[in-house]
Amino acid sequence: VLFLHLVMQRNFFIIAAVFIFLEIYIYQAIRTLTDNNWIKIGYCIISLAVYGFFAYEVSHFSRADRSMMRAQIMISLFLIFILPKVFIVLFLLIDDIFRTGSYLIGLTRPSKNFFPERRKFLSIMGLGLGGVLSALFIDGITFGKYRHKVRRVRMNFANLPKSFKGYKIVQISDVHSGSFADPEKLQHAIDLINEQNPDLVLFTGDMVNNVAEEFKPFIPLFSKIKAKDGKFAVLGNHDYADYVSWDSPEAKKKNLDTLIDYERQAGFDMLRNEHRIIEKNGEQLYILGVENWGLKPFPQFGRLDDALKGVPESAVKILMSHDPTHFDYVVKKHPANVHLTLSGHTHGMQFGLDLKNIKWSPVQYKYPKWADLYESEGKMLYVNRGFGVLGYPGRVGVLPEITLFELA
């Protein structure tokens, strides 16, 4: 969100020119389809209001603003009102290029190269596709972010102690509590977690967007999560509150301490480059947790060596690390055999195709390991699609995830 604001501030006139170009074509499409002046006037008024809001937000952006509400409104308007127009313009632009090209090479005269019915058909096609995309983004905001899905994964470990056969672990990630106005709307998701009857619940970071107070209203709700052997958590990049300004380093540190305390009140034991031992019938399972480690500019506070101190080499180890790049750059190259790493961070970009045989999201071009289970050099990584939302306050195609692992 910060990056989006900076880009728009620095390239304001270029972006404004692109928007003007879009609107010229859109107005042509509307004029092709209707002679009703009230429709044209209404569209112009709405457009001016939306662009006026954008201009105001970009010019008044400040890192002192801790709320994501205004940013969410801006992103939603962009996705619902502006992005779909690209489809309309694409259809009309192709028609214009075809007509201009035919004229330039002498195939037709301008008067014979204009087909109003073709123009009308292309306008309808563009408006139709744009309308569908807008409807999907609206649905994602209204319903999609609450369609939590349980994904079941069976994990086979060659040296798993017998006492842990059938052991059930639930992973959730990226709650981003500040993106939700009403905790009660997430009650069904908490019920889904408890219905899995987990032995252990692991949270892999980003409980908030910016500040600890976002999570305070959610403490009673997340306290309802039940797990026989406890609930553990690690920090994500957003938990450090790097995306808002602070009066002093002490104030920023106090915010982090407050967040950790709030998560403790909700029943989560925060692992900061350390481990915990789960023991059953004299046999052990080791749960490791590191602080966030990602490629710059993300924090690199994770210390795997510290988390491994005192852990037997032969032990089955499950690592919580928020950012999946930590797996590729550190974990899989580490001499210790960390059997399974659990991450989040990508959200699946909250948009894409997430079908059984077709998986695509724009985020895969930044994070090749963006969702599901991966294996590399004998070690496993699972990337959770996230529990909440950030920026765009919805989900299209990539649903919020609760992962249930059964050890075998």
Across the structure, where does each feature detected by a protein language model lie?
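Non-catalytic terminal accessory segments
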Residues: 1-146
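Detector for methionine-enriched segments
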Residues: 8, 68-69, 74, 125, ...
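Arginine residue identity/basic-tract feature
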Residues: 10, 31, 63-66, 70, ...
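Hydrophobic alpha-helical segments with strong N-terminal bias
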Residues: 69, 136-138, 158, 306, ...
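C-terminal segment of N-terminal export signals and the immediately downstream linker at the start
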Residues: 102-105, 135-168, 180-184, 188-191
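A short, flexible N-terminal coil/short beta segment enriched in small residues
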Residues: 116, 123-126, 133-156, 254-272, ...
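Soluble catalytic domains of enzymes that build or remodel membrane lipids, polysaccharides, and related
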Residues: 160-408
